[in-house]
């Protein structure tokens, strides 16, 4: 896989993840509105349980989409590090991406714990 293909795959992954993130953020808002309506209208216990389950599922899925952002960056850094180790010439941007995203030849592991602090760190290195 070439450097351009790695960046293209990262771009596609981030675009798709952003769409899912926006959708789940909206559904999380809907869950919040549904909860407030259920509380204000003195809804039954079944409705409150259904709204709570819907809200928890929406929150989990939103967190999952945020976790895929980090995983996408780690996977791209891993692919660039493997490309570098294979002897291919990389651009200065690719080398700085490997450094900024802690790229290594070890395969990244998916984690459900997104790191918002690392997002700001990555954004600072983009400029």
PLM-predicted stretches and their roles:
Residues 1-32:
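Cytosolic-side membrane-entry/anchor segment at the start of a transmembrane helix
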Residues 3-12, 102-116:
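Membrane-interface segments at the starts/ends of alpha-helical transmembrane spans
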Residues 20-27, 52-62, 122:
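Hydrophobic alpha-helical transmembrane segments of multipass integral membrane proteins
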Residues 35-44:
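Membrane-interface helix-boundary motifs at transmembrane edges
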Residues 44, 115-119:
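Helix N-terminus capping/helix-initiation residues
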Residues 47-89:
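Inner-leaflet juxtamembrane helices
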Residues 82-113:
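Short membrane-interface loop/juxtamembrane segments of multi-pass integral membrane proteins
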Residues 120-127:
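Conserved small/polar residues in nucleotide/adenosyl-binding loops
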């Amino acid at each position: 896989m070439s450097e351009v293909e790695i960046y293209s795959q990262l771009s596609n992954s981030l675009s798709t993840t952003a769409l899912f993130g926006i959708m789940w953020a909206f559904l999380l808002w809907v869950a919040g509105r549904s909860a407030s309506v259920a509380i204000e209208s003195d809804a039954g216990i079944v409705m409150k349980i259904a709204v709570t389950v819907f809200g928890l599922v929406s929150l989990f899925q939103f967190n999952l989409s945020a976790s895929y952002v980090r995983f996408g960056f780690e996977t791209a850094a891993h692919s660039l590090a493997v490309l570098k180790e294979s002897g291919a010439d990389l651009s200065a941007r690719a080398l700085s991406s490997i450094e900024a995203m802690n790229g290594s030849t070890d395969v990244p592991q998916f984690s459900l714990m997104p790191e918002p602090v690392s997002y700001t760190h990555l954004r600072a290195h983009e400029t």
